[in-house]
Swiss-Prot record:
It comes from Trichormus variabilis (strain ATCC 29413 / PCC 7937) (Anabaena variabilis). InterPro entries: UPF0145_dom_sf, UPF0145_YbjQ-like. Gene3D superfamilies: Hypothetical protein apc22750. Chain B. SUPFAM superfamilies: YbjQ-like. This is UPF0145 protein Ava_0420.
């Protein structure tokens, strides 16, 4: 499966556009990680645990995007965009949302 952020694949011809595919990954907050990240925010520095979480989430979202594209008969996904956001859940915390979107295509 070819996955790319571009709208074309060099050397390939798009035979058919199969539709938009979207995949979401949601992570719940973790009290200890959030507490330690808050301390780092105050004293400065990077929060490695959140960086790793974002990296993992992006990989998972792209993997799910590939699976959904394969179900449509695609062998490539073009124009991939990854968005991140948070969802506030009352007083209990925040959910991290990572969304990947692209166009499933059949190429030769």
């Amino acid at each position: 499966m070819i996955v790319t952020t571009t709208d074309v694949i060099q050397g390939a011809v798009i035979d058919s556009y199969l539709g938009i595919v979207t995949a979401e990954v949601v992570y719940g907050s973790n009290f200890l990680r959030d507490f330690l990240a808050g301390i780092r925010d105050v004293i400065g520095g990077r929060t490695g645990s959140y960086e790793r979480l974002f990296e993992q989430g992006q990989r998972k979202a792209i993997e799910e995007l590939e699976l959904r594209a394969q179900r449509l008969g695609a062998n490539a996904v073009i124009g991939i965009e990854i968005d991140t956001g948070t969802i506030n859940v009352d007083q209990s915390g925040v959910l991290l949302l990572i969304t990947a979107t692209g166009t499933a295509v059949r190429v030769r």
